[in-house]
Each structure stands twice: as C-alpha cells, then as structure tokens.
C-alpha cells in the first residue's frame, strides 16, 4: 500500500466508530529522565487513569462493537487492555492511530503548535513558526488505517483527543470519554 493521503472521494463504507480517549497518563518518570518527542509516548497511565479505564471497561456500549482497535501509544494501549479484558473484544494495535504530530520538541512548542492548529482551523500556514500535522493529514491517516476494518460495522477505537476531534465536534474530550459517530471509510 502506498503511503500518502487517502483519496477522500473514494470512500464508501459506513462504519460506527465508538471513539474512546485514553486514560490520564503519568509522565513523571519520563520527565525526570528528560525524555522528549515519541519518548513521551512511553508514559503509562496514572493511578487515576487506571481507575478511569476500569470504569470505562464496564460501559455497556463497548460490548456492541465487534473489535477494538488501539493506538500503539502506551497510554492508549494500557486503556485498551482494561476494555478487552472486560469485554472479550479482539484487539488490534495500529501505529497510525498515534497522537497528532508536532515536528518540534518541547512542551512549549507543542502548546504553541496546538494553539496555531486551532487558530488556523487545522491548516498549516506557509509562514508557521512551528511545523505540525494538519487536520487533513490526520484525517487521511485515520481513514487509511481504518480501511483495513471495513468488514466490521462497529469498532471501538482507543486513541487521542486531537485525532478524535477530526471526526467529532466536541471542543473538550475528557480522559476515557466515549463518543459515538459514523464515519465513511
């Protein structure tokens, strides 16, 4: 399969997605060791995040799915582990469901990029001081990934806020929040 943007005009299969944002992460150990970039994606859930995931796993809506697809990022995968243990859903791990990419390191750059992203409605302006993944790139990455699951009608997707926001209007998405939507794949 060639990498690149999915042709959004060639979609056709409707899929019910039950989006779940991962539980609250604990970055303390990684920050103490000065991890940056994708190194921060190794953060496990905090104790609160584990409680959130345990509560989430009892949500009856999740049992209506046929499969759970999770981001490979630790906080999402740990959240997914609670759900699959309780529901018995088969689990697939997808590296393309990772968090939104900012091509600069540091929390300050991430926050600046997030503000620019929101201010520019997901576009990357030519004169942007920080490079980041656009809304169109994120949406395309998600659709490319989910095309593998077209045979399923209902899929739980454990992922990240910025990725979820490309498909749902929610301004704020809490840890372990569940949001249903229909997506054309």
Question: Positions of the model-derived regions?
Answer:
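Acidic, low-complexity terminal tails and accessory targeting/binding regions
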Residues: 7-16, 59, 92, 96-115, ...
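Active-site-proximal alpha-helix that buttresses catalytic centers in soluble enzyme cores
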Residues: 16-92, 177-179
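Generic beta-sheet signal
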Residues: 17, 66, 153-161
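Short, active-site-adjacent cap segments at secondary-structure transitions
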Residues: 26, 76-77, 100-101, 163-165
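Phosphate-handling substructures
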Residues: 29-30, 34, 39-44, 85-141
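Short, well-ordered beta-to-alpha junction loops that form the rim of enzyme active sites
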Residues: 70-74, 96, 158-162
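A short, acidic, amphipathic alpha-helical segment used as a generic capping/interface helix at domain edges
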Residues: 138-150
